Amino acid sequence: MRIDRRAALTAVALLSAVSLAACGGSPSRSSTGASSDDAASGAVGGEITVFAAASLQKAYEEISTSFQEANPGSSVTFDFQGSQDLVSNLAEGSTADVLATADTRTMDDAAGGGLVGEQREFATNVLSIIVPEGNPAGITGFDESLNAEGVNLVICDDQAGVPCGTATREMEEATGVTLHPASEETKVSSVQEKVESGEADAGIVYATNAASAKGTEEITIPDHGIVNHYPIATTASASNPAGGRAFVDFVLSDKGREILAKYGFGAPSDSSAAPTSAAAPAEEATENG
């Protein structure tokens, strides 16, 4: 039987809060662009470590390229994992400058442990189904075809706190369909990989994974109001807080949102909030900034 890791994660996070108490008040969530206090006045430098949900990998790698072009003295290092694992690693003492998760629940776990500062929503995502080309198992949607005899279905693990697993469980509740997967993964990219390799007949992933998956077909499903909201925050353990703030601002900028949209991410829920312009270097702007 699977063990719910959220209770253990929260306990570790709360212990970490004792040593981080000096970092101050309660963080809040916002989907607005960068504030004037946070806006970068020029180029930033140094290494910036970003812990980001696995579903963000392709978009964030492109964002990093643009960010480093605008800030030639900077270097961005990523750790892409399931959101719950990233928070657990922070709670256990790993250091990062930025945390970006695939849902607000895992970010709230981090906030409850004093691990992050102000949260800002920067994107949204919904579930979709991917199947190998030709759809050999005859999957028709989020329905009983996923439970048909011989169908090898792969989903994300809700009990491990994986955001796409939580969304999948909510979809089960909304549709009345109880899935019987062959395996449950701790990050959505693992689900995608199993379908791409032909190991699975169907996988429940995000729409962004479906857009980038190779050798697969997408079967869209109504979202039933189940939308994952992606927050980002600088961390209390940041060794380069200025760089972390600059990266957050870049993600929230027009350029950042343009790249996220390119990879299929939806706009933040507060779409009326005006994004910021990406900060240009103090001395010499690059053509591709």
Locate predicted features:
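Short, glycine-/small- and polar/acidic-enriched structural segments
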Residues: 119-127
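Bacterial N-terminal signal peptides that target proteins for export
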Residues: 1-12
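Exported/periplasmic ABC-transporter solute-binding proteins
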Residues: 2-3, 24-56, 61-65, 69, ...
